[in-house]
């Protein structure tokens, strides 16, 4: 976002006509920057949370349009037609039916919405219900994301130069980086990753574990085969805001540890395993056989190597 705003400030048309607002959505949706002129806009820190509440995001967007975008009256000219860039990398985890219908009935004709799916797990079918301008970004080599940011900047600049025109500028495509997503297959859910949250047993600070499903190629066959397993991609420290931005509704989704390959260490204290389960159903870190206090529920726990079957079910996040 810093790069986008920096480039827009160099363009006199954008500097004079464009105002920017930022709505973030994970398990919840909130406006983190209300409509603001570019000259004094300060790029915010984007939050991280569990879930993709697209319905809530649409509801928040319409509230901001109704309250922040000035309408033309007999006394004064209102704002130009808003341009909205909707970026999402997953499928909605809330019910979007009512909000999609309300958008199509009352807002679609008044807003130029450009929806961009980020990666193969984006629910393009839902995005197509909102707008004809559905694009897909797939990062395939180093530097693609930087070029994608440049594409957004160029698109905003083009719209700022066309204010007052009846016809909006056509969306340019940058080779394989951003392309129209008309014929992409619909994915009902993200089956390519598993996210789990835990807490450090020493510092009580939270962390996020991510497992990804690897594509397997069979020699001589021109297709990839997804196996029923996930490899560890990383374990990352997060802050308490993660839970404030996550959907607290229980999903009932679980995964068995037999499907998860690799045990990460704790990113906070360095304990050997960030994957120990308390009877409360939450994960914590341990450093081998030990007596610890669960940082979630304060229960005293004793872990040992008993040589038995250690596979168990664990609650997975929304992604």
Regions found by a protein language model. Name each.
Residues 124-188:
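C-terminal helix of von Willebrand factor
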Residues 200-203, 266-269, 277-280, 294-297:
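Short cysteine-rich clusters marking metal-coordination/redox-active sites
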Residues 204-211, 272-274, 282-284, 300-303:
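Cys/His-rich microdomains that often coordinate metals
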